[in-house]
Amino acid sequence: MRVPKKERQRLLQETIEHNPFIKDEELSKQFSVSIQTIRLDRMELKIPEVRERIKHVASEHLDEVKSLSMSEVIGDMIDLKLDDSAISVLDIEKEHVFSRNEIARGHVLFAQANSLAVALINDELALTTKADIRFSRQVHLGERVVAKARVMKLRGDGRTDVTVESYVGEECVFDGDFTIYRRGEEEQA
Amino acid sequence: MRVPKKERQRLLQETIEHNPFIKDEELSKQFSVSIQTIRLDRMELKIPEVRERIKHVASEHLDEVKSLSMSEVIGDMIDLKLDDSAISVLDIEKEHVFSRNEIARGHVLFAQANSLAVALINDELALTTKADIRFSRQVHLGERVVAKARVMKLRGDGRTDVTVESYVGEECVFDGDFTIYRRGEEEQA
DNA sequence: AAAGAACTTAATACCTGGTACTAATAGCAG
DNA sequence: CTGCTATTAGTACCAGGTATTAAGTTCTTT
């Protein structure tokens, strides 16, 4: 039943992660050590007491409502030549990924690319009307995505074709062809 | 400062509902009564102590995470038949629109549709690999968007084609064809 | 085998945010 | 004034800890 300290602490961490509601007493039974040992372990691993853990879970729940405000999922613009080309950078953080596997959600990459394409247009009103997009590689928590947009064709009728390619390092992770409508008040973005 | 009992209890209930983390002590200050009075009030109203309230909020949260992260869908899922069809509703609010003209940003509609398409897939891992989308009408602040997703083709190779159409009332405002990858750990969403 | 270090357990005082219960007081109506 | 409700006070007790000091118990290393 009894496992060495290192192993016990690894298991402890896992156990608590998967059930934050468990008390020291239960843990001590589960690992067949004294309560004090569990507490030392928690200290070393910097795991807070059960009430704090519960509070943490609960408070995450509360912000969930406002979490996906989406308003600024767009990254930082680092270069912009209107009606020509633009570059933005987005660091993938916790709120951008599926909690289960830490892979960035599709609409995050889309949002970065779309926002960039729209920003590129030198006009008061610019709205996306159409987009063909491909996700070519997963993007993980902590990675930095650089999106590069270029105007391909400025049509006379108010439509502009913009291509966006997003990279993590050398690798292309996303690309899309956007048609942006400018000026008029029809169409959609 | 001091309000009659009935009124105080009504406010107490509201206060706690909107902030379940509040302690008796704070409440007693807020209502300028003693802690004991607050406790009598809670008794009468059958409101549990703060730790229980927090635990309750937290456990709701856990359920959600386990129940295949409905929370990760944007908008409210109102119907879901796995691997068949799904419907979600999203009310367009301030954070979804361009402040200049109160038109919903493209990636908001995309996010609703994309999330719905991904949620539809009856698998642990589901990631968008490709999407062709069209925005056919502007969506304005305050409008309610209903997205309807339907699985079109379940290919053998792990790819599934999903079509999503989003409506405001009778009008189609967005539609898209998504290719979702399931299972494996390649590709991207 | 003895010494030391690392690990484990024990014991005790104290903390927060309560419950449960008893009793005293305040404020007002009849 | 009596009676009633509402409020406040006080005490004992609880869970689930923290923090600290001290005492074993192993394991290793010389």
UniProtKB/Swiss-Prot annotation, chains A, B:
Keywords: DNA-binding, Fatty acid biosynthesis, Fatty acid metabolism, Lipid biosynthesis, Lipid metabolism, Repressor, Transcription, Transcription regulation
One Pfam family from the record: 4HBT
GO molecular function: DNA binding; DNA-binding transcription factor activity
GO annotation terms (biological process): fatty acid biosynthetic process; negative regulation of DNA-templated transcription; negative regulation of fatty acid biosynthetic process
Superkingdom of this protein's organism: Bacteria
Function (record text): Transcriptional factor involved in regulation of membrane lipid biosynthesis by repressing genes involved in fatty acid and phospholipid metabolism.
Family statement drawn from the similarity comment of this UniProt entry: Belongs to the FapR family.
Name of the protein in question: Transcription factor FapR
Species assigned in the record: Exiguobacterium sp. (strain ATCC BAA-1283 / AT1b)
Lineage: Bacteria, Bacillati, Bacillota, Bacilli, Bacillales
